[in-house]
Amino acid sequence: MDKKTRLKLDGVIVCEGKTDQARLQQLFDVSVITTNGSALNQRTINLIKAVAKKQPVILFLDPDVAGQKIRRQLEQHLDKYESCFIARKDMKPNSTKIGVAEATDAALIQALQQRQVFTKTTQPTLSWEQYLELNLNSKSKRLALCNKLHLSYFNHKQLFRKLNLLQLTFDQVCQLLK
């Protein structure tokens, strides 16, 4: 896409590396901060925290172990952030790597359109007892819910935490499960 047809985004995207940055700026008119992969340092964390006070921060990290680790590390420092998720199936055909730079244009655009806002709260919107009532005992049920929310897969404790960060109530989750 040329500069005239790139989609304008509000906020700053946080991604892992320079190839991710180049790929995102090829499609979107947006500022990008890179973490330099798993070499995320306190200086970069402080920069992201400062930016988050003034404009939306969008975490757009690879769907691999390193990307999940960076995401968890940044989540600890941010009170509010937006998050995009891409799946392994969203990679370009014949791609040997799995990441933002290797995802299809359509997958990147869709992930940004379906991004979720996460907010730390002192009062959970969903209790552990309510969560257990949802009967998300099987991985397939949790995966189906994660897919409806455009999230990567999470285990029980992680999903419970994410649902609260999304500020979803018991009734809202029940509606999603129908």
Curated annotation (Swiss-Prot):
Chain sites annotated for binding Mg(2+) 2: D62, D64
Catalytic activity: Endonucleolytic cleavage of RNA, removing 21 and 42 nucleotides, respectively, from the 5'- and 3'-termini of a 5S-rRNA precursor
Keywords of the record: Cytoplasm, Endonuclease, Hydrolase, Magnesium, Metal-binding, Nuclease, Ribosome biogenesis, RNA-binding, rRNA processing, rRNA-binding
Pfam entry (one): DUF4093
Domain Toprim: 10-103
Cofactor stoichiometry and binding remark: Binds two Mg(2+) per subunit.
GO terms under cellular component: cytoplasm
Record function comment: Required for correct processing of both the 5' and 3' ends of 5S rRNA precursor. Cleaves both sides of a double-stranded region yielding mature 5S rRNA in one step.
Protein name: Ribonuclease M5
UniProt organism field: Mycoplasma pneumoniae (strain ATCC 29342 / M129 / Subtype 1)
